[in-house]
Amino acid sequence: MAKSVFNQEKVDFTKEHMFFGADQNTQRYDVFRHPVFDKLNQTMLGYFWRPEEVSLQKDRADFQNFRPEQKHIFTSNLKYQTLLDSVQGRGPCLAFLPHVSLPELEGCIVTWDFFETIHSRSYTHIMKNVYADPAEVFDTILDDKKIIARAVSVTKNYDAFTEAADNWTHHKKGSMREVKKKLYLAMQNVNILEGLRFYVSFACTFAFGELKLMEGSAKIISLIARDESQHLALSTHVLKLWSQGKDDPEMVSIAKECEEEVYDMWRECVAEEKDWAEYLFKDGSMIGLNETLLHKYVEYIANRRLKALGMKQIFDAPVNTNPLPWTQHWLSSSGLQVAPQETEVESYVIGGIKQDVDEDALKGFSL
């Protein structure tokens, strides 16, 4: 049966599962089954920004003075980032949103997808300011074998889930458990994408920024990284609610059943990111960064993500020792201390309200 955009039956959505429950009716944000998603949504909305707010005037001159190997690193990463956010600019709404049962998660996913579109516009903003003809970069993305090879692993679980969900929803082909299994793997794939696949390219852009090169681009990527940390938190919360039995009970056994497959997905991603690092530095490394350091960094990030999911760390890098400690202040908004008139202030939150203030907090104030 086709889904309705407005279910006229009364439903207590605080008792529904996150996915494949009753069709939704009123979008209400006063009572929640999982309040964490509304809090995440509020945080993301408070971080609203536009790439045009960041000046790229100096970046154009910096890029023109780059050596060929530096241009290769910067351009290849931009192309790869464009691919990833092209997937995420439509993936969450296309794949997950039709099957969401909770208003708070629905709102969170819509905001998530909207910010991914800002990221895609950001890459266009950088290209239009740095290259004489941005089309020369855009038109070669689908011709780049290294990028297309990555597109397969990035999208295959999304596509498998959307196909299975469509077959079940509209044709009653397959089984609900199989659809849920593919949903679980698709969400794990998103967690890997948001939590690891960007970080080699992030590190390279931040390394240029550390050298006072392409600083505008580095600040834009820092804003994107801040957003991606929220998107990572979203998928991490979904996965942990499933594995801990706090949502759909059937997802507990599905999580256990898929555990080794998930570890293989992480291994595949780490191998691909290491291969990408080698491709970036095939003509030479850059000051402060080389493929060996990036290999360690990829394993370090992967282990941290696995730990956050409550899974075992399967790589050699210790989770408490960052091989690239200087990247941290680019990934932390509060670490960038700048004058407001000079650049985009990343730690500024729009519409931030503290709602848990009691009467005691106002003691000592008088009018």
Predicted stretch roles:
Residues 2-367:
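Non-heme di-metal
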